[in-house]
A protein has these predicted regions:
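A beta-strand edge to alpha-helix "cap/lid" segment located at domain peripheries
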Residues: 1-25, 35-129
């Protein structure tokens, strides 16, 4: 596993599945012990995240990783960065800018997303560092 492998999975599999609404692909990507920590501090497990996407009507229309820093530690990798996302929920469009940490683990020669945490940034904070 190297940084390029991790970013490919992050962009193509994770962001790709979110943008296309492919819950089966997300389910396959998320590890069984996956945890999402939202900007408000709430924490969801794999099934809760998939249920929220399915029943909550959340649809992403764009996701852009603006700054990325990948760290690889044997069979674990972290993506640290800043991102912009636009999504629709309940007929309302929201655009957010946030910092993120995504932790991937290598399981049976495949990268699986084990943890994702985001911290929303005020709209007037520059994404560039």
């Amino acid at each position: 596993m190297n940084a390029q492998d991790v970013l490919k999975v992050h962009y193509e599999q994770f962001y790709g599945a979110l943008l296309s609404g492919d819950l089966n692909a997300l389910s396959a990507l998320y590890s069984d012990n996956y945890r999402l920590v939202r900007s408000d501090g709430s924490m969801l497990n794999k099934e809760q995240v998939l249920r929220d996407l399915r029943e909550g009507g959340l649809a992403f229309t764009s996701i852009m990783l603006c700054i990325e820093d990948v760290r690889v530690f044997e069979t674990t990798a972290m993506v640290i960065g800043e991102s912009h996302a636009t999504a629709i929920r309940g007929g309302f469009t929201t655009s957010t800018q946030f910092r993120l940490v995504a932790v991937y683990e290598e399981i049976d020669s495949a990268l699986r997303l084990a943890y994702f945490q985001s911290t929303q940034l005020p709209h007037d904070v520059s994404v560039a560092s």
